[in-house]
Amino acid sequence: RVYYTLYRKGEVWSVDPYNPEDNRKEVGLPRMGTGVLMVWHPTGNFCYLIMYERHTIRRSDYNPETGQMSMPYFICGKDNVRNWNDGVGPNVRLSKPWQGFFLKNPSYKGSDDEYDFYFSDNGNHCVRTLSPLGKVHTYAGRADGGTSGYREGELRTQAQFNYPEGIVYDAKRKAIYVGDATNRVVRKTTQEEEP
């Protein structure tokens, strides 16, 4: 199935690409008229709903027996409060979280969930990670007190972004590519550079 959101109605829908008549509402969202980006976990067991206009990330679990998604529940950030703070759950502050991807973390081998979620935090000019336990950590950017800019260097103490949006992982090259929107460049970091 292909999943999509309806902005004005605040709903998640899905359609069977081989049978467009099979188009159905999956679940309602906590807010109508707010932008939402969906990123599915590699297992297909759940997806993150990035509510970038509300500065939060929510989660909806998928039940393979019923084929239904659960009502989205809160993971991190505070509704309609934009700021910056690493931490867990409601103590985290985000500012327009944007795109993201899941990346297997070797240190989680044998755990129920072996993936960290990397995402661009547009208004905070940085890239952050969300662990399976809900801990958010700034991965890159925010050098010089979180100011925007364009600078290469060590990920946390030197690198600067200017409203990053797109982010993707290239498994072949073991590299993360970040669409640094206002700088109008695509930036690259490798896992060897991680702090």
Q: For each predicted feature, which ranges?
A:
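A short loop-to-beta-strand structural motif that recurs across blades of beta-propeller domains
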Residues: 10-13, 55-58, 125-129, 135, ...
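Blade-level signature of beta-propeller repeat domains, shared across WD40, Kelch, NHL, RCC1
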Residues: 163-195
